[in-house]
Amino acid sequence: MSELSAQVRKALDAAVTAIGGSPRDGQIEMAEAVANALTDRHHLMVQAGTGTGKSLAYIVPALVHGRKVLVATATLALQRQLVERDLPAVVPALEKVLGRDITYAIYKGVGNYICLQKMNSTEDDPDGEVLLEVSSLGKDAQRLHAWAKTPGITGDRDDAPEVDRRVWLANSTSGRECVGADNCNYGSQCFAANAKAKAQSADVVVTNHTLLAIEIVDSHPILPERDAVILDEAHEFMDRTTQAVTEELTSARVIRAAAMARKYMPGKLADAFTKAADNFHDAMTDYGDHVRSDFSAQGRLEEIPSVLESPIRKVREAAQAITQSLTADEEAIGTDAMAERARVKGAITEVSTTAAKILKLGNGQVLWYEPTFSTLHLAPLSVSHVLRSNLLTQTPVIATSATLTVGNNFDAMAKSIGFLVGNDADVAEIADDEIDPANVQMLDVGSPFDFANQGVLYMPKHLPEPGRDGPSAEVLTELGELIDAAGGRTLALFSSWRGVEAADLHLRKVLVDLPIKIITQKRGDSVGPLVERFAKDETSVLIGTMSLWQGVDVPGDSCILVAIDRIPFPRPDEPVMSARASQADEAGGSGFMQVSLPRAALLLAQGTGRLIRSVDDRGVVAILDSRIVTKRYGSVLLNSMPPLWRTSDGTVVRESLRRLAQKSKD
């Protein structure tokens, strides 16, 4: 054993003891691999199943090295786990072993913190006006303002009283609008600036995928300098990056910017912008009516719709004229403070920039219209190149998740993050001081769980293949019988809202005489409270859609059955995924095998992973889609999932569920 391995093991033992755990082979293997990656400055992908304890497996070796490390997660839940539970529990023990102080911090984007300048502004604000019109929003604003004056608070949205989204927007700012602490009247008290200052000196900084993605794509430093980047929940990083750099243009945003222009610099330029905003609003309304009445018009747009192109162009021209005027004449909006001026300029610049990008629509981009909120979206077709150039050549990157492989192969996920694998690895061109994106080790440390003895994978062959009209009567009947056998205790996962609504209607009829509570996710519901209700009531059923497929952690008797309505292939009208599949087809490959199947495999692995969350868990995963056993691609899906014991015998499965339900009662 090398000296480094011995140091890592000693520190890991101390950390595990501090949380009352026990050493795990997979955790030790992962920790040593992370230590070697940091020493040799190469990249690492680690698939670490639930129960491995992967957070300690990357934190401990990073601290042993004395490296400044940035940990980026996809979910708020994991950020909180790291900062509120894991790090506070293990840092005192690690400080004793390493003989030095250890610091850690969490840092988020500016918009996640209250802006004191905006909250205390005496100027009228289009955001603030809305709050005066609705009494409930006014009360929310009062609560938020009172909280902001509490000594010692972080100003973080996640610590604030729960308020309407519009209230938060009226009391926070964006990166474009923020003038910076040095130029702000409240700079010394600025919550965002204080959080960033704390993060600058910390050994471990925890942030989110989105903020890291924005920094990478914009090539503009937002986060502290670091010696290594750890991507936890790495299976989501490509999607989070795509979402972070997706531009949005809405009537509401344009009208808001025009209203700000009228207030701060009334005149011909503002009048022209207002006229352009009104015309754009009318055009978007008309186009939305067309899309809602014509199904074929939905999905990806190959070009800018003719009815929208001229209105978008006029918005861009009017907005550009105002920003140029503001730049040329710093006093154009009167005597108000620089921060107010920056907010106005930032909001208008954002509209101008987005409109300009849409007008330059190219082959490497995807444009679509979303009718629910009347929004034009513009996204990159791929983000792997920019991730490779701006992330993977700079520092060692440790990418980890419970689901990184598709059919036991890392390549699909590796390519999505930007790593060079296979034939692509031979064409890498890097500078002497850069890290090779092809120099990546791939490791699967397994899971401490005995899946074959802890769980059953039920794959009924008799069910019809799913169609476009939601779950069939046969699927709903099968689901009801399984829930009956389990006495509730079920997480039912659906790939569409139509499926959720159909299941809710059916189950409330067939289970009406049973002591089973049905909890159904509604559009806009926060996931946390739903899961909390489900976990507390052992006889409940939680029915939900895609947001429940990942991150739900309910060990014990409250969840002995996870039912999945269908293989979660991307919808044909999903713009970005369909565009990526088409690109693969046009290049002579297979959009289904290269895009659709890997996406479905990762989601299915995440969904099935909701069942076994501890060594004591027992239960059944039911995939109510016969294609998993009747289609050739089913083997790829099965090899991407936890190795549960497999059967298509419904009688055996229902009897197993009855025994588990009875055991939980005893």
Where on the chain are the PLM-derived regions?
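Conserved RecA-like P-loop NTPase helicase motor core
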Residues: P448, P460-G470, K522-V629
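Conserved helicase motor "Helicase C" RecA-like lobe of SF1/SF2 P-loop NTPases
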Residues: S495-K522
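Conserved pre-motif I regulatory segment
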Residues: S2-M45
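Walker A/P-loop NTP-binding motif
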Residues: A35-N36, S55-K68, R85-A89
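Signature of the SF2 helicase/ATPase Hel1-core->accessory helical subdomain module
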Residues: V64, A77-R80, E84-P88, R176-E177, ...
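A substrate-engagement module of RecA-like helicase motors
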Residues: S2-V16, R67-D203, Q320-E331, T372, ...
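A contiguous, basic/glycine-rich beta-loop/short-helix subdomain that forms a polymer-engagement track
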Residues: L169-D203, D218-H220, I322-K461, G470-T477, ...
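Walker A/P-loop
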Residues: T39-Y58
